[in-house]
Structure formats: structure tokens, C-alpha cells
């Protein structure tokens, strides 16, 4: 039997829009701690608080995003959120006070929270159900390519250009992404009956256990994407920190090429479990790097890159599986809510990781302690998924 068609113009446009959105995001992500330190003289704890405002704002808007997307036309909401996300990069260039920067960061988080839920939901509308896992994998691959180039280019530009130039490049990327988003055509959506507002219109209750497991897993991920460059500088690793993101993105990209197909074959819980085992190992090794640097700096530098690649494989394996897991627990008229719950769970953990990572490093004297605590949380998440979230999914999945 011939496979359902995966590639379409709208699928290509939304991939491009997603890449440009995340390129704009990742371009400034690793330089923001340095920007706050240089421009506003913020300490590690304050940096963690400010950066977490973005994630907390995205978290707050996620449940409402899911409800709005399940109730109203999705494309206009997607374009509105994308335009706001794009414009705020210009605001960073004129923010002369820390308080103004914080307000802009919160607004940016709201826009990011809405546009990512909308993009994921529209993607699911476009994809044939028989190739959903594969399509989600390629969609995530666009994120990974952005992650491969964005942080590396951002860190390079930090040493050669002003911060305003970097923000301008993010603004340009966002503008091009908005054009791509405008080209996306969505299938006709049947009007739905306006049901009374209840908890399950904002949060997929059946996804609670999987959400807890994903939340625990995302805490150390948030610590890594934000603080790994500072950690490398702290312990004296000579490798360009931008390479960490490049190799991590390579791992994410390679793993997505096969994990989505395994998900479409029904091996969702197996794929997630294997990814969790590898993720736990990478965080323990990341925590051990500080001590290993005293033993053999050259070996530790190579290990640093190896950890990045392995971490990418671990999370790239899990992302399409977790996304599909939430969608498969929900009826078709709650796709937005399912996507919102998936991303909300992720954002809660990222926000905790941003705040906790800086605070742990400040109080205990190094980011290695933050990554050690993150490794322990990954082990806890693995046990929780194996004995609670996974069995619950197998009992309650709708497809």
C-alpha cells in the first residue's frame, strides 16, 4: 500500500517558519547571560531569575493558547503571535533599564508560548495521521538545525559585534519567518460546539503523569542550554562553547530521522525509555567534567563534545515520542490542548532549570552541582515513566 503523502507546500513553509523562529531564539539564547552581566551588572541568581521570566510567561499562556486554538481559527492566532514575537527583538535594542528588559522578556515569553503551540497544532492538522511521528520528527529537525547554527553564530558575533547587531539579526530572522508562516495554508476546520469552560479545555488531564515525567526531564535540559557556556568557561574547557550546541543539534537531528518512524510503528514508550537512559548518563558525565579536568584536560574537552552529541541523540529520540504520546491521549478536537499540555510540562521544567541552575551554582560554588542534581532528576523521571506514566498511556491511548 502506498504511503500517505508527507511533503506539501504548507508543510515546507511551516518547517521554514519554525526554523527561522528558533534561529532567532537560539541566536540570542547563549549571549543573554553575558549581555545581562555586561549591560546591567547582574549576578548569576539575577540572571537566572530574568531568563526564567521568559519561560514562566510562556508557561502561563500555554493552557489558554490550547483553548483558543481548539475554539477559534488557528492561522490568524498563529500569525498574530508570530508578529509579536518578531517585533520584540527591536525592543531589546532600546531597553535602557533592567526593568524594561524584564517586561519585554515577559511579553516575549507570552508570544513564544502562543506561537509554538499554534505552530505544533497546525502541523498536526497538516500531517496525515499515519505519518504523524515522522512529520513531527522533521518539524523538530528544523529546531535542531537552528540550534546547531544559532548559538554558535551568536557566540561568534558576541566577540566581534555589538549586542544590537545580534538583536537585529534575530529581528531579521523573525521577519523572514513571518513571511513563511503567512504562506501556510491550513485545512478547513469544522465549527465546534462551544462547550462550557472546564479544566480539560485548558489542560489534558489524561496527560498529567506523562507531563510530570517530562517536567522532571526538562529541568536539567534548561540548565544545559542556558549555562553550559558559562560552565565550560568556569572549569577551563578550551573548546569553543558554540560547538557544544552544534554537536548537540547534530545528535538531535540524526536521532529524529529514525525515532519518528519508530513512533509511527507504535513503539512510543520504548523510544522514550531508551532516550531517558542515555540522557541520565550524559548529565552525570557533565557534572563530572570539573573533576576530570584536573586529571586530563584534553580528554575532558573531547568528552565535553561527546556529551553534547549523546545528549542530542537522547532528547532527539524522545521529543517526537512525547509529542505523539500527548496527541494520542486526546480526541481530535483537543489537539491544541494536548500540544499545550506537552509544551507546558516542558516549559515548567525549563523555567525551574533556569532559576535553579543559577541559584545552585551561586550557593554551592559551581555549575557541576547543578548538573549533578539534574542527573538525579533524570533518573527519577525515568523510574516515574517506567512504572507510572508509560503504563497509564498504554491503558488510555486513543490511537
Protein language model regions, located:
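Helix-loop boundary and gating motifs at the non-cytosolic
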Residues: 9-48, 218-231, 235-237
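Helix-breaking motifs and short loop linkers at transmembrane-helix boundaries and internal kinks
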Residues: 41, 73, 94-99, 267, ...
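Residue-level signature of mid-helix packing/kink "hotspots" within the transmembrane helices
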Residues: 55-63, 147-148, 249-253, 257, ...
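Conserved MFS/SLC helix-loop-helix module at the cytosolic interface between two early adjacent transmembrane helices
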Residues: 60-96
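Cytoplasmic helix-loop-helix junction between adjacent transmembrane helices
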Residues: 106-142
Amino acid at each position: 500500500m502506498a504511503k500517505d503523502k508527507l511533503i506539501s507546500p504548507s508543510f515546507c513553509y511551516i518547517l521554514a517558519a519554525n526554523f527561522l523562529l528558533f534561529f532567532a531564539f537560539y541566536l540570542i539564547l547563549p549571549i543573554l547571560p553575558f549581555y545581562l552581566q555586561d549591560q546591567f551588572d547582574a549576578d548569576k541568581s539575577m540572571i537566572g531569575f530574568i531568563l526564567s521570566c521568559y519561560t514562566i510567561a510562556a508557561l502561563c499562556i500555554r493552557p489558554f493558547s490550547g483553548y483558543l486554538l481548539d475554539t477559534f481559527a488557528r492561522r490568524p492566532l498563529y500569525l498574530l503571535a508570530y508578529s509579536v514575537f518578531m517585533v520584540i527583538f527591536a525592543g531589546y535594542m532600546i531597553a535602557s533599564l533592567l526593568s524594561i528588559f524584564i517586561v519585554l522578556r515577559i511579553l516575549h515569553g507570552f508570544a513564544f508560548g502562543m506561537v509554538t503551540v499554534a505552530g505544533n497544532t497546525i502541523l498536526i492538522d497538516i500531517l496525515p495521521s499515519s505519518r504523524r511521528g515522522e512529520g513531527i520528527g522533521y518539524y523538530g529537525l528544523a529546531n535542531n538545525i537552528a540550534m546547531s547554527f544559532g548559538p554558535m553564530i551568536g557566540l561568534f558575533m558576541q566577540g566581534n559585534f555589538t549586542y544590537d547587531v545580534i538583536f537585529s539579526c534575530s529581528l531579521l530572522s523573525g521577519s523572514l519567518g513571518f513571511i513563511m508562516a503567512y504562506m501556510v495554508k491550513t485545512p478547513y476546520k469544522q465549527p465546534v460546539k462551544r462547550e462550557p469552560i472546564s479544566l480539560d479545555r485548558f489542560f489534558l488531564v489524561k496527560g498529567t503523569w506523562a507531563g510530570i515525567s517530562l517536567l522532571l526531564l526538562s529541568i536539567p535540559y534548561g540548565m544545559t542550554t542556558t549555562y553550559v557556556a558559562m560552565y565550560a568557561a568556569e572549569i577551563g574547557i578550551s573548546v569553543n562553547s558554540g560547538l557544544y550546541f552544534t554537536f548537540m543539534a547534530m545528535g538531535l537531528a540524526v536521532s529524529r530521522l529514525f525515532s519518528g518512524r519508530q513512533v509511527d510503528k507504535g513503539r512510543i514508550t520504548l523510544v522514550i525509555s531508551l532516550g531517558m537512559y542515555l540522557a541520565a548518563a550524559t548529565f552525570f558525565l557533565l557534572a563530572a567534567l570539573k573533576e576530570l579536568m584536573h586529571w586530563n584536560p584534553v580528554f575532558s574537552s573531547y568528552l565535553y563534545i561527546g556529551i553534547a552529541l549523546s545528549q542530542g541523540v537522547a532528547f532527539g529520540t524522545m521529543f517526537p515520542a512525547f509529542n505523539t504520546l500527548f496527541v494520542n491521549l486526546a480526541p481530535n478536537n483537543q489537539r491544541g490542548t494536548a500540544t499545550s499540555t506537552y509544551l507546558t510540562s516542558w516549559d515548567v521544567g525549563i523555567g525551574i532549570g533556569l532559576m535553579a541552575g543559577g541559584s545552585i551554582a551561586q550557593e554551592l560554588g559551581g555549575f557541576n552541582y547543578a548538573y549533578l542534581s539534574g542527573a538525579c532528576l533524570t533518573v527519577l523521571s525515568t523510574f516515574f515513566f517506567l512504572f507510572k506514566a508509560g503504563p497509564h498511556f498504554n491503558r488510555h491511548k486513543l490511537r
